[in-house]
Amino acid sequence: MSLPEPLLRADWPRERLLRHGAATLSDPELLALALRTGVAGCNAVQLGHDLLRRFGGLRGLLGTSPAELQVVPGLGTAKACVLAAVLELARRTLEEDLVRQDALANPDLVRRYCQAALGHRKVEHCIALYLDARLKLIICAEVARGTLTQAQIYPREIVREALRHHAAALILAHNHPGGTAAASAADIAMTRQIRQALALIDVRLIDHVIVAGAATVSMAAQGHL
């Protein structure tokens, strides 16, 4: 097996970033800066390419857990931890955006946040995004954790947390590990039950987002609310 060609210094991602700015670098090159070095037979840029291919691009990588990163051949604990920290900062950036922006006016931002939070989970999790009267994020909380195929959600717990956080509205999201981003009959029935429970305390259920890997679907957009 031939070794990868070494990069000329002028072509190093760090040198190009300093000269031309981070926006001029490709996704693998930006990852290379976080990784710092490659592994045997693979430079840092090639390792960045490999990670993006393995996890399905940036969106898939954003939903990757530290444990999943550690099993990548040659990546190692140190690189996995650095990369996990960078990805967590990216997730928190999405959360900051939700704190500052109207969630109803930014459905794509909501879907990206939910995918980042749930896309890598191996069992079903359900989260609730509690929103204020201006539909800005107050807090995101896990409301259920289950098995590969189901998570038991209790409407009373969601109602109690809505009251505790003085929420005016909320968005639910849960994942389908290994499945498709489509609402099941059980999903639809539970969502309507939760919506009715929240209506009793004058809290609006805006949406229920289903996540399956890098894919998301809005139950509101599909007419299920």
From Swiss-Prot:
Residues 103-225 form the MPN domain. Keywords: Hydrolase, Metal-binding, Metalloprotease, Protease, Zinc. The keyword Nucleotide-binding does not apply. The keyword Zinc-finger does not apply. InterPro entries: MPN, RadC_JAB, RuvA_2-like, UPF0758, UPF0758_N. GO terms for molecular function: metal ion binding; metallopeptidase activity. PROSITE patterns: MPN (PS50249). SUPFAM superfamilies: RuvA domain 2-like (SSF47781). It comes from the Bacteria. Pfam families: RadC (PF04002), UPF0758_N (PF20582). A motif (JAMM motif) lies at residues 174-187. One of its GO terms (biological process) is proteolysis. Zn(2+) binds at residues 174, 176, 187. Belongs to the UPF0758 family. PANTHER family: DNA REPAIR PROTEIN RADC (PTHR30471), UPF0758 PROTEIN YEES-RELATED (PTHR30471:SF3). This is UPF0758 protein BB3258.
